[in-house]
Amino acid sequence: MGVHTGDSITVAPAMTLTDKEYQRMRDAALRIIREIGVDTGGSNIQFGVNPDTGELVVIEMNPRVSRSSALASKATGFPIAKIAAKLAIGYTLDEITNDITGVTKASFEPTIDYVVVKIPRFAFQKFKGADPTLTTQMKSVGEAMAIGRTFKESLQKAIRSLELELNGLASRVGLDRGIPEGFDRQGAMERIRQQLRSPIAERIWYVADAIRLGMSNDELFALTKIDAWFLDQLRDLMRVEQRLVEQASGQGSLDDALLWEAKELGFSDERIAQLTGLAAASIRAQRSAPGSTRSVTYKRVDTCAAEFEAHTPYLYSTYGTECEARPTAREKVIILGGGPNRIGQGIEFDYCCVHAAMALREEGLETIMVNCNPETVSTDYDTSDRLYFEPLTEEDVLNIIQRENPLGVVLQFGGQTPLKLAIPLSKAGVPILGTSPDAIDRAEDRERFRDLLNRLGLQQAESGIARSVDEAVSIAANISYPVMVRPSYVLGGRAMQIVYDQAGLLEYMGSAVKASHKHPVLIDKYLSDAIEVDADAICDGRRVVVAGIMEHIEEAGVHSGDSACSLPPYSLDETVVEEIRRQMTALALELGVVGLMNAQFAVKDKTVYVLEVNPRGSRTVPFVSKAIGVPLAKLAMKTMIGRSLDDLGFVTAPKPVHLSVKEAVFPFNKFPGVDVLLGPEMKSTGEVMGIDADFGWAFAKSQAGAGAMLPMSGMAFISVKETDRPAALQVSKQLHRLGFGIQATSGTAGYLRDHGLEVKTVLKVTEGRPHIVDLIKNGEVALVVNTVGTAASHADSLSIRREALNKGLAYYTTMRGARAAVMGIEAILKKELTIRSLQEYNCRR
């Protein structure tokens, strides 16, 4: 209790309730639904149970489907929302047939003979200063789910599904290979106790370490209030870990009996290798040896605990002797999904996976989906012909490939998760459909990418690759500050930063990353005041169609996933747009792209610089597809199985006569104290879209969709860095013409006043009261425009941005964003709103 449902590790079926408690809850739930008056549809009810007395309390009731409903649907195979929709139009439960059994009715309550574990995924590293304590405010950004025969197996599968570079309950204090000589047991135990006192995302790993160091169940329960049953399960896993360590160190190998015991408990090959010092490949070879009596097997989710046969192949892995996979003899393709949602990799990629599955069905091929995210459409049992609810690791994917023997595997739709498997799968002889792993590496590897651009005669900002701090200092000095720094091979701009001087670079190199030959740091000249552009293309290996070119509304330096963007570009010259189209075509053909490709460019003084190229589906594919009315992911999938764009009838992209604006949605209200200032590290968790024939209206709609309604009147507060003052003057003049009053801090106010604008000077927070934050709190400000330059100004203006967020004000931290906001306000005040469906817009192109 006290931790939001979405942030809790969840287990089904309930493991620690008595049958009497379960029946009381079931009866209470039915009485509540009838009392509230829910005649049809789904409802969610949360209870609290006192484990000592059995006292039952109702926490809340939602007369609708909820996040828990989605999880329950995936856990049981019982599609709650689908059935609720049928009930709403007049069906009764006994009239709806269960899709999975094809025999039973929806009135037959689902029963499961396996264990499901859901673990949330967090992104605290993205939000400097955020409190990592888990409370009643949900803070997770995604989740992974696993299915196994036991809680232990399911828990370990769920942990590796999170993609945290952890293979299991890895020690946080260096105890994976036992307690080392000279280890400070007392100091480590105190650190662990400190971590256990409050609920945090990593708590379960610290519980494992506490068990390794001998902490009793009584003390663990006193610190965590985790039920003793779960503590005993974790203790059993730690005992097996210890036996693995001892046997491997004693005889240099593992007996088959212990290996199979570990595999049945959900230990991955990598985790066993980590514990024993043996190679993961040798462990795989041992368990795959000819004549072995046991192997990885697959069971079906059937909603009825095997009482009836399941006709829908919804599968999970375990270790045993009887396999229910029953692969068909049809030609088939495996699609790897994106895993748990996270910042930088969300449902945009799931959209691509689902459309790929649709395309394969249209082409008569059997579709196999592999994913572990219960929030997605790709893990619906009827999206693909066969669904494997499994972690997206090399081991788990190879096991499925070995069982199914597909024509090939699709990696380019699930984001970075499946792309990381390109090389190991290729080495294992697995056919990769679409763009080759070598082409992906040419685009990802900075030195090979530079050679590619030189070969094509394309421009790139000056850059260098540092493998040490000294190299970084030397490269940055040669390029000249400001520079953009980031680790190689990342998605979502993780640990990416703009640094303005050597001191900032040294701080970054010391805290954000550890540079090495295996993990170099990329340093690029930061193109200040440049316009960033995103472009998506589709290629069949011979023809390239540039489907969409998007102009970012925020300037270069704000992560592409966080910037609003417009399709088509709203301010770029047509000559620049054509040059970007030419460069996209050259890049796709040189890389040998088959399928989708995304590239990002910076435009400065009409010169186009290539920032990066991603020969895969990008997060902008759904936006572009809806903006132009073409299912790009579907077409791309068809090119990957040999169809040409000419054959598919897609040889040029439509030119829409309307404008589409994508705006990012941020979780800042979940993290009090976190700065809302945008930069090269991605922070958004979703996006919305506005469409209109007029850019101003399209932008205004996108802001409303993101929950930031543009004001129609009132006072606008302007405080900008010195280089932004000319742009701020133009914005202020436009706002003044629209009837807004202007407030500004002393420096900005003086500049505006010197250029003939009437402006009221307000105090900074450090200059006395009433200051600007007081005015925002008192409701005297309607719009905030705040840009910063130095680190000191970042800190000085943090409270302004935070209070604007708290009050729900429209706020802009770039001048291009502010200019777009003014265009939106002007459209609302002076231009007529037209309402059309998406289909109508796409028919008018």
Residue ranges and their predicted role:
Residues 1-247, 251-258, 265-266, 290-295, ...:
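ATP-dependent carboxylate activation and anion-phosphoryl transfer catalytic cores
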Residues 157-158, 285-294, 299-458, 467-474, ...:
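ATP-binding N-terminal substructure of ATP-dependent carboxylate-amine bond-forming enzymes
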Residues 223-232, 274-285:
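Short, basic interhelical loop/turn and adjoining N-cap
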Residues 260-265, 271-275:
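Extended, domain-scale alpha-helical bundle/helix-rich regions
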Residues 444-447, 490-494:
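Conserved A3 ("GATE") glycine/threonine-rich loop of ANL adenylate-forming enzymes
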